[in-house]
Each structure stands twice: as C-alpha cells, then as structure tokens.
Amino acid sequence: GWTLNSAGYLLGPHGIDGHRTLSDKHGLA
C-alpha cells in the first residue's frame, strides 16, 4: 500500500491518520 501511503502524505495529517487507522484495524502494519 505504498500508493495509499504516498496519497496520505500528500493529503496531509488527516490522510496519514486515516491510513494509519485502517492499517491498525486490519493489522497491516
């Protein structure tokens, strides 16, 4: 999910936070 990661950084803190939350819930650290 590097694409999502890059998108998150581009979107800003909210994007990063959302991505991290999804990773946490799915356990895809």
UniProtKB/Swiss-Prot annotation:
Family from the record: Belongs to the galanin family.
Superkingdom assignment: Eukaryota
Subcellular compartments: Secreted
Lineage: Eukaryota, Metazoa, Chordata, Craniata, Vertebrata
Keyword line: Amidation, Hormone, Neuropeptide, Secreted
Protein name: Galanin
MF terms (GO), sorted A to Z: galanin receptor binding; neuropeptide hormone activity
A GO cellular-component term linked to this record: extracellular space
Protein species of origin: Oncorhynchus mykiss (Rainbow trout)
Function: Contracts smooth muscle of the gastrointestinal and genitourinary tract, regulates growth hormone release, modulates insulin release, and may be involved in the control of adrenal secretion.
